[in-house]
Design a protein with these regions (language model features):
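Conserved N-terminal glycine-rich FAD pyrophosphate-binding loop of Rossmann-like flavoproteins
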Residues: 38-58
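Conserved hydrophobic helix-helix packing surfaces used for dimerization/oligomerization
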Residues: 8-10, 31
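Glycine-rich FAD pyrophosphate-binding loop
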Residues: 25-45
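Conserved N-terminal helical subregion
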Residues: 2-8, 52-196
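Active-site substrate-recognition segment that forms the wall
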Residues: 203-207
Length: 207
């Protein structure tokens, strides 16, 4: 079978899955993307796209559209979390050296806008919403996918881009689920003048 005839299934229609589908299509390969959500909703928060990402998004032909819904910071400022004291700064747009050095811009974008831009570039081609993966079966030369909606798909290659609770990973690792690392991270936004007053709210905040 030539590479053009390979049936590729991507489990997960997030940032990784959609970007992969676009990259494969640019190389003449079609991937079917199966996403459990019935619609691509506005979930998540800000995503930082440094030059290694924006360079590839430009190559995929989607950077200009994404730039319209992105911000390009003047500089990245690092502050002490307790008193707001400035520790360091990394110029981005301020002196123009970032693009000069890396050949692409640094953007901040909402995850939903990034996902929407990627799915829009696919034009709906090969994107199947409402497909929650139920089981994977090794059929020798092919892999059988079954979804909770009763649909099935036979693929020559399956890519797992289905997140932290990946069904594909459980299949590959013989049922092993996620393993807690012992570390959690929480994020939020507060007004800058509230920083010193809110820095001690978290339990074990000095650990």
């Amino acid at each position: 079978m030539g590479s053009q005839g390979i049936r590729i299934a991507v489990a997960g229609g997030g940032i990784g899955g959609l970007t992969l589908a676009l990259a494969l299509r640019q190389r003449g390969l079609r991937a079917e993307v199966f996403e459990q959500a019935t619609q691509l909703a506005e979930v998540g928060a800000a995503v930082a796209l440094s030059a290694n990402a924006t360079r590839e998004l430009r190559r995929l032909g989607v950077l200009d559209e994404l730039a319209a819904v992105s911000t390009e910071p003047t500089e990245l400022i690092y502050r002490n979390w307790q008193d707001g004291r400035r520790i360091a700064a990394h110029p981005v747009r301020k002196d123009g050296r970032y693009q000069e050095r890396f050949g692409a811009p640094y953007y901040g974008i909402h995850r939903a806008d990034l996902q929407r831009g990627l799915s829009g570039a696919l034009g709906g081609e090969g994107l199947h919403l409402g497909h929650r993966l139920a089981s994977i079966e090794d059929q020798g030369d092919t892999v059988g996918l079954t979804f909770t909606n009763g649909h099935s798909f036979e693929a020559d290659l399956v890519v797992g881009a289905d997140g932290v609770r990946s069904m594909v990973r459980r299949f590959v690792t013989d049922g092993e689920g996620t393993v807690y690392s012992g570390t959690s991270a929480f994020r939020g936004i507060v007004a800058s003048d509230l920083g010193p007053r809110t820095s001690d709210l978290g339990k074990h905040d000095h650990d």
